[in-house]
Amino acid sequence: AKNTDLIKEFNKGGDIQFGYGPHAPYTVSDATFEKIIDQAQANNTWIHTHLHETAFEVQQSMTDFGMRPVARLAKLGLFDVHSQAVHMTQINDEDIENLSGKKCHIIHCPESNLKLASGFSPIQKLYNAGLNINIGTDGAASNNDLDMVSETRTAALLAKAVAEDAEAFPAYQAMYSATRGGALAFGRDKMGSIQTGFEADMIAVNLDDLNTQPVFDP
């Protein structure tokens, strides 16, 4: 009820907006997820949950529910509403198929996943399946910092190793995921890009230092 009150108070087009954040499938019951899905639809907002973060989570779901977490949440209808799946390291082709064409956005937190040895998210495969990828940091306790520039660089480099393809997740795609992709994940259609009519949320980057060289845009 408190969450819904905040949504009704703040979700009026301002800079601060709220959604629902059920932690993860292994801490939230089907009944609670169903209530949250109904509330998100009624209040036209998003749902944010950690998903397929560890192998244990997937194994436990198979034991408790007889299906993988993505399949369970797909059955409940989570991905039919605006949703965000955080981490997504322990996934297979069936999981990707369950998400493809749905309203789910992927929040990739590579440095947190590395620190916790949780696994590697195949973000190029997810991107190829039509899913919106965006960059996150998780929390400082599992990351050491909340540096989005560092996180984006790590995402771009790690994706190449995971895909075994030097052309996977190139710099422009990584930058899009850190900006426009993130805006879309939170339903902010007028953010994340320099366009007429968009909100002018920008930073200036000094490219004169040696550590920014060479500057090359093919």
Regions found by a protein language model. Name each.
Residues E34, D38, A71, I96-E97, ...:
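Alpha-helical segments flanking ligand/cofactor-binding loops in enzyme cores
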